[in-house]
């Protein structure tokens, strides 16, 4: 079989950068054990991924959504901790009795990296 070229794939995915991302993601999926949608023909995983894109046997939008999901980094544990800390601060009445000067010092301390005193 003839080698696949980028020009064959650009007809299916017009943006070359998106093509690189999609084909690399598909090649990683193949390396991880995903089933092949075309015959391997002794080709390496990136070439197989490009052939799948060129032959239009892979769902481009589905592959794009999978790629976006894997690139997103959401640390839900940290978000939950921050929300709990905010709720605890709102429930604590002592910060409501803080003077304006104390508030400014606390904010400057946070800004300066936690230093309590300036030298």
Swiss-Prot record:
Answer yes or no on keyword Oxidoreductase: no
Enzyme class, broadest EC rank: transferase
Please give the superkingdom of this protein's source.
Answer: Bacteria
Catalytic reaction equation(s): RNA(n) + a ribonucleoside 5'-triphosphate = RNA(n+1) + diphosphate
Entry GO CC: DNA-directed RNA polymerase complex
What Gene Ontology terms describe what this protein does at the molecular function level?
DNA binding; DNA-directed RNA polymerase activity
Gene Ontology biological process: DNA-templated transcription
> Pfam families attached here?
RNA_pol_Rpb6
This protein's UniProt keywords: DNA-directed RNA polymerase, Nucleotidyltransferase, Transcription, Transferase
* Signal peptide region: none
EC identifiers of the protein: 2.7.7.6
Name the family. Answer: Belongs to the RNA polymerase subunit omega family.
Q: What is this protein's function per UniProt?
A: Promotes RNA polymerase assembly. Latches the N- and C-terminal regions of the beta' subunit thereby facilitating its interaction with the beta and alpha subunits.
Record-linked HAMAP family: RNApol_bact_RpoZ
Q: Could you describe the subunit structure of this protein?
A: The RNAP catalytic core consists of 2 alpha, 1 beta, 1 beta' and 1 omega subunit. When a sigma factor is associated with the core the holoenzyme is formed, which can initiate transcription.
The protein's name is DNA-directed RNA polymerase subunit omega
Q: Which gene encodes it?
A: rpoZ
């Amino acid at each position: 079989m003839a080698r696949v070229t980028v020009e064959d794939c650009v007809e299916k995915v017009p943006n070359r950068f998106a093509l690189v991302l999609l084909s690399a993601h598909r090649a990683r999926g193949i390396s991880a054990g995903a089933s092949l949608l075309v015959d391997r023909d002794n080709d390496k995983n990136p070439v197989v991924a490009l052939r799948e894109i060129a032959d239009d046997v892979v769902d481009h939008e589905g592959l794009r959504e999978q790629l976006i999901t894997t690139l997103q980094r959401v640390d839900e544990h940290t978000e939950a901790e921050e929300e709990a800390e905010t709720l605890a601060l709102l429930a604590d009445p002592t910060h409501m009795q803080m003077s304006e000067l104390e508030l400014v010092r606390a904010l400057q301390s946070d800004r300066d990296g936690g230093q309590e005193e300036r030298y």
